[in-house]
Amino acid sequence: MKRFLAISVMAVFLMAFAACNEEEHDGAGPRRGNYFVTVLTGPTSGIFFPIGGAFSSHLRHIGYRTSVTATGATVENIRFILSGQGEMAIAMSDAVIQAIQAYGAFEGQSPATELRAMMGLWPNYVQIVTVEGSGIKSFEDMRGRRIGVGAPNSGVELNARMMFEAHGMTYADANVDFLSYGQAIEQMRNGLIDAAFVTSGLGNATIRELSANNNVAFVPVEGEGLRRLLELYPFFIESHIPAYIYGTAADTPTVSVMNIMLVSDTLPSNVVYDILESVYSEEGMETISASHSNALNHIMLSTALRGISGTVIPFHDGAVEFYRSRGMMN
């Protein structure tokens, strides 16, 4: 009897062990309820938050335990992922590259080689917003003016710093305020700021609010400053802000950089594969596309590799397996 009991206990143990191994094996569907996925986004006034919230909602719907967290956006999200405070995070690809190569905002830190990408999202446009009558019609016109450059070490502020550098200027050439773009535009509404950097998708809600009672204008990124910027930081993409987006007089030349979804390297490959398979399903796309026009226009399987392929940013193994199964990777 004791021998039979011992054999029975051992059999149960082996079955449980085999089940665990099966769950971690590539291609096996994960037990979704066993995983808690925190999605790191950005300020509630920006675009990261509603789109990240849609990802969290969809994950909850299909059985994952999940939450969405408002943050300071890109740089904070990268640090939270690295410290284990989140499993998925929206971030601008330029800042991810800086973290991996330990320069810019990550100067002096160890290269963040454990960062992993899951998918490309939508382009972030550098929108240097002002109002008509401010006297700011070129980047150089911001000399000596009050400029909101983003919260310290945020993705917006990193872009502002690179823009100043490309135009042969530093923050010392202007009166800069380290404010989030929501705060900066509120200050502009009150006449306390002359221009503000807003790096986000087009149709930003805070700029739309400003345009309700002001004739907004954008500082162009063009000429020698643009040439130098693309030479220094080739991850930027030459772009423009269409006039119809905010009702400006004409299209404005600028640059953009892709947002991507980072994923913790501690998540098993089959979980990442499962998330991607579900996100790119008809139901997943319907939920995410409804969150914002930028999600509707840009987040789709055909753009999944954009902003990641050809850079130093590695994909998570589960993402590699998924894209290979779709014939998108060798």
Describe the residue ranges of each PLM region.
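A structural signal for short loop-to-beta-strand junctions that line the ligand-binding cleft
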Residues: 107-121, 244-253
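Bilobed "Venus flytrap"/periplasmic-binding protein-like clamshell domains
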Residues: 34-62, 66, 124-190, 309, ...
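C-terminal motif of bacterial Sec signal peptides marking the signal peptidase cleavage site
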Residues: 15-19
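N-terminal (or domain-start) structured segment
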Residues: 27-92, 98
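Pocket-lining segment of extracytoplasmic ligand-binding domains
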Residues: 93-95, 103-104, 170-262, 266-267
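Sec-dependent signal peptide recognition
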Residues: 2-10
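An extracytoplasmic/periplasmic, membrane-proximal ligand-sensing/linker region
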Residues: 37, 179, 183, 190, ...
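Bacterial signal peptide processing site
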Residues: 21-23
